[in-house]
C-alpha cells in the first residue's frame, strides 16, 4: 500500500496578537503519497503558505496533527524534528534563498553536510545533481552570477540533494517570466518521475498547476 509521506489531520492554526485573534486554517485534512504531484491554488491570504509551513514542521499548529513519514511531529523535540525534516522533505521558495557568499556547489551540498555527510560525498552528490539540472558548468559560480531561472534550478537541486520523499514548493516560479517558469516546471515533472519524489506546489498559475496530478483549492483556510 502506498502510505502517505506527509499528512495532516484536522489542522487548525490561529494567530493571536493583543486583541487580534485570527483563525487562518480551519480543520484541514491532506494526504500526500509517494510520487504524487499536488498543486494548491487560492487567493493571497487564504492560508496556503501557512499550511506549507505547518506541513514542513517550520511552525506548530494550534490543534490537529502533522505526520511526516508516519511520525507525529508533536511527539518530537526540535532536534529530532529538524533531523526528520532534513531527511524527508525538500523546500523550494519563490525566492531562491541561496547564500550569496557560497558557490552554487556549496549551496547545494549544504543540506547533506548538515545531515552529517562527508565533504567529499556531499560535493559529489551536489555536482551530479547540478549537472542533471543543466548547471554543470556553473557549479563554481556564486548565485549572483546566475540568471533567475538558473538560481531556481539550483534551488531545486538543493531541495533534492538529500533524496527527500517530498518537496514543498511555495510559488516556485512566481519570480520568473512565463517561458522560464514553464522550463522550471518541466524540470520538476521530470525529477518527479526520475526520483519518485512527491511534489506539493502552491501556485497562482492555473496553466502550470494543471500539469500536476491533482489541483486543490484553498478558500478562507479550508481546502475545497
Curated annotation (Swiss-Prot):
Entries under PANTHER family matching the protein: IMPORT ATP-BINDING PROTEIN, LIPOPROTEIN-RELEASING SYSTEM ATP-BINDING PROTEIN LOLD
Lipid bilayer topology: Peripheral membrane protein
Protein name: Lipoprotein-releasing system ATP-binding protein LolD
Source organism per UniProt: Methylococcus capsulatus (strain ATCC 33009 / NCIMB 11132 / Bath)
Gene3D superfamilies hit by this protein: P-loop containing nucleotide triphosphate hydrolases
GO biological process, one term: lipoprotein localization to outer membrane
Localization: Cell inner membrane
Domain of life per record: Bacteria
InterPro entries attached to this UniProt entry: AAA+_ATPase, ABC_transporter-like_ATP-bd, ABC_transporter-like_CS, ABC_transpr_LolD-like, LolD_lipo_ATP-bd, MacB-like_ATP-bd, P-loop_NTPase
Amino acid at each position: 500500500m502506498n502510505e502517505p509521506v506527509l499528512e495532516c489531520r484536522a489542522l487548525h492554526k490561529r494567530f493571536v496578537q493583543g486583541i487580534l485573534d485570527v483563525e487562518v486554517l480551519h480543520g484541514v485534512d491532506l494526504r500526500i503519497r509517494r510520487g504524487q504531484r499536488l498543486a494548491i491554488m487560492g487567493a493571497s491570504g487564504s492560508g496556503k503558505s501557512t499550511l506549507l509551513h505547518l506541513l514542513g514542521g517550520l511552525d506548530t499548529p494550534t490543534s490537529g496533527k502533522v505526520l511526516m513519514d508516519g511520525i507525529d511531529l508533536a511527539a518530537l523535540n526540535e532536534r529530532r524534528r529538524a533531523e526528520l525534516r532534513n531527511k524527508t522533505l525538500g523546500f523550494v521558495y519563490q525566492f531562491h534563498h541561496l547564500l550569496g557568499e557560497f558557490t552554487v556547489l556549496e549551496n547545494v551540498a549544504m543540506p547533506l553536510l548538515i545531515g552529517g555527510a562527508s565533504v567529499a560525498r556531499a560535493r559529489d552528490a551536489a555536482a551530479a545533481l547540478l549537472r542533471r539540472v543543466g548547471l554543470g558548468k556553473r557549479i563554481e559560480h556564486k548565485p549572483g552570477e546566475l540568471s533567475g531561472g538558473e538560481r531556481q534550478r539550483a534551488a531545486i537541486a538543493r531541495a533534492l540533494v538529500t533524496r527527500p520523499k517530498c518537496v514543498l514548493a511555495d510559488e516556485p516560479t512566481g519570480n520568473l517570466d512565463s517561458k522560464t517558469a514553464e522550463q522550471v516546471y518541466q524540470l520538476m515533472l521530470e525529477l518527479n518521475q526520475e526520483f519518485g519524489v512527491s511534489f506539493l506546489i502552491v501556485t497562482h498559475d492555473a496553466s502550470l498547476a494543471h500539469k500536476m496530478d491533482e489541483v486543490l483549492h484553498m478558500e478562507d483556510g479550508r481546502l475545497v
